[in-house]
Amino acid sequence: MKFGEVEALRHVNLEIEEGESLGILGRSGSGKSVLLHVLRGVEPFEEITGSVIYHVARCPQCSHVEPPSRAGESCRCGGTFQPFEADFVSLGINDPKRRDVSRRIAIMLQRTFALYGDERVIVNVMRAVEEASGGSISVNRAADLLDEVNMSHRMMHVARELSGGEKQRVVLARQLAKSPMMLLADEPSGTLDPKTADLVHESIRRAVDDFNMTMIITSHWPDVMVELTDRAVLLDHGEIVSIGEPSKIAGKFVAMAGKIEDRKKTDVGSPIIRCKDLSKRYISIDRGVVRAVDEVSLEVYEGEIFGLVGTSGAGKTTLSKMLNGIVMPTSGGIWCRVGDDWVDMTILGADHKGRATKYMGMLHQEYTLYPYRSVIDNLTESIGLSLPFELAERKAIHTLVTVGFSEEEAEKVLTKNPNELSEGERHRVAMAQVLIKEPRIVVLDEPTGTMDLITKIDVSKSVLNARDELGETFLIVSHDMDFVQNVCDRAALMRNGKIVHVGTPEGVLSLMTKEEEEEMLGS
C-alpha cells in the first residue's frame, strides 16, 4: 500500500484466528497504525493491492454479523447465520456488506480521545450505548461498561478533566458499547507512564476475556506484547520480518534497537546557571497557595547534561521554565553566565534577561514542524534564519549530522517534508531546528515522552553527540529514568517543589520512593 511515492506496507501476509490476541510490534513509522486502519475498513485507500478478507457469520435476513463460529446458529431476528466472506479491497467503501462487517469492529486510536469533553463520563458512555442500540438509552448498561473498565469512581466527572489513562479507559467503554467481535487497539498506552499504562492494559485484558473478542494491538513497547498477546508480529519498514511467540518477538525488537555505550565521564566547565532560594507560588481556588517550586538552590555547569527528574507535579517543568527565562520567580534569584558576565534573569530588558535568553533554546515535548515545507525550510526560513542557499544548505547538513544523521542521509532529508519522516527522524530535525540557532544552553522537555525503544536510543545518541560536537549545555526535564541514566552527567530529584538530592543518576535512583519508581521506571 502506498501514500504517493511512500510505500507504507508491502508483502504483508497474515492470518488471525477467532478469539486470538495478536500483537504488532515495531518502531515509530514502521506501518503499525496504517495496517490497523486497513483492517478497520472505514477509510478509502487509493493505492492498495492484495486482499483483506474477513471470514464471518452473517444473517441474510437482518445482515447482522458475528464471528465465524456462530455459523448455523439462530440470529436474534429469527434468521440463521451463514458463512460469509468480505474482501475490504474489492468491496467499495460504501458497500453494505463491507459496512456490515466494519461496524462490528471497535478501535482505540493512537493519542486520540474521542470523547464529548464537556459531558460527564456516564453521559459519554450512554451516548455510545444509544448509538449502538439504535436509539435505546440504558443507564444500567452504561454503568456496567464503566465497571468493566474500572471507571465507576469517575462516573460523574466531566470528561475533559480526566487524566490520559482515565480518558483511554472511557474510550474503551464507549467502544465496548458496540459489543464488538474485534478490538483494534492502536498504541493504547503509548503516551502513558508505566503505572497508568498497567491500569489501561488490565482494562483491555479484562474486556477481551469478558466479551470474548479477537484483539489486534499495536505497540512500540515489547512488554505490552508479552503481557497482552498470544502471538506477535515484528513489523519494520512496512514488512513483517518475524511472527511468533511474544517474548521471542520482543527479544528480536530489543536486539534491533542496539544499545548506547556506557556513559563516559566528561570534563565540564565552570557554572553557567545558578539559582538561590528560588520559589514559585500560584493561587488555586480549590487548593489555596500552591508552592510549585519551593526555595531551590542549584548550579549547572557549562558543557554538562543535567537532568531534572520527578513525578508529574513535582515542579520540574516550572523550575526549568524559570531557569530558561520563560517564567518569573515569586522570590529568589537566577543568574546565567554570558561570557564572563553573570546576568540577573529576574531583571527584564534586552540588557539584562534578554542578553542571556538569546543564547537559550528549548525543545518542547509537543514540538511542531511546518508540515508542508521542506526540512531545509524548517531549519532556515521558517524560523527566521536568513542565509544564502549554499550556506544554509551547508549549515543544515552539519547540524543534521550533529543530531545523528549520516551526511548522505542529511542530504536526502533536506528536500523531504516532515510527514515523510519517521517520528524519530522528525524529533531529530526538531532538535536540529533548536541547535542551528547556536544556543549555549538547550532545555529538552520530556524528550522521550512517546518514543519507542529504538527512537529513544537514537535521540540519546543525538544529545550526547551534540554536546561533544558543539559543546552545548543540556537541561533535560524527564520522568524517564532509563533515558536520564543513559545521557545525564548529574541529575536533581524533585519532590513537592523541593530538590531532595543532586548527584549521579544512579544516586538519584537509589533515593526514589516506590511511587516514584512506578511512574519513572519502564515496566
Question: Predicted regions span which residues?
Answer:
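Helix-to-loop junction immediately C-terminal to a conserved catalytic motif
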Residues: 40, 324
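Conserved ABC ATPase "signature" region
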Residues: 137-154, 391-412
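Catalytic Walker B motif of ABC-type/P-loop ATPase nucleotide-binding domains
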Residues: 183-186, 442-445
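Q-loop/switch helix immediately C-terminal to the Walker
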Residues: 119-131, 373-385
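The feature captures the beta-strand-to-loop junction immediately N-terminal to the Walker
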Residues: 25-27, 309-311
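ABC ATPase NBD coupling module
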Residues: 60-72, 83-106, 342-361, 511-512
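Conserved ABC ATPase signature
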Residues: 158-162, 166, 417-421
